Amino acid sequence: MLKERVLQITKEMVGIYSPTNTAEEQKVEDYLLKLLQDMPYFKAHPENCGAFACADDCFERSTIYGLVEGKSKKTVVFMGHHDVVSTEVYGALENVATDVDALVEKMQSVELNEEATADLASGEWMWGR
């Protein structure tokens, strides 16, 4: 069940049109914040998640945070960023670069190098920007 949920979230995030260095990145922020806010822990502790505005950012982007308090005095911090690779690198497949399933289907008819062909055939990789 966890694996399926992780795959679902990944596909949903890949599907968000959010080019780097645009206000469109806020769509990913909105998604991530809602994802946290919908979790039972954060419903019970809403003060422990939110958005922190990036100072002087011309696109008014934010950093999303969530703090899960435990019983230990130790703290574990997970950090990341959510900008994306441009879809332009997909060339003729740019129109499906944010649709994981459609991209894999279209890639079947594209000439790829040997390694990429093997990776595509394996079914072990998720493709998309």
Where are these regions (language model features)?
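N-terminal capping segment at the start of a domain
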Residues: 1-26, 30
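Generic hydrophobic, helix-prone segments enriched in Leu/Val/Ile
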Residues: 13, 25, 49-51, 84, ...
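Long, contiguous hydrophobic alpha-helical segments, chiefly transmembrane helices and signal peptides
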Residues: 10, 28-32, 77-85
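Active-site metal-coordination/substrate-binding segment of hydrolases
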Residues: 74-129
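A non-catalytic alpha/beta surface segment that caps or lines the substrate-entry region
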Residues: 19-73, 89-100, 125
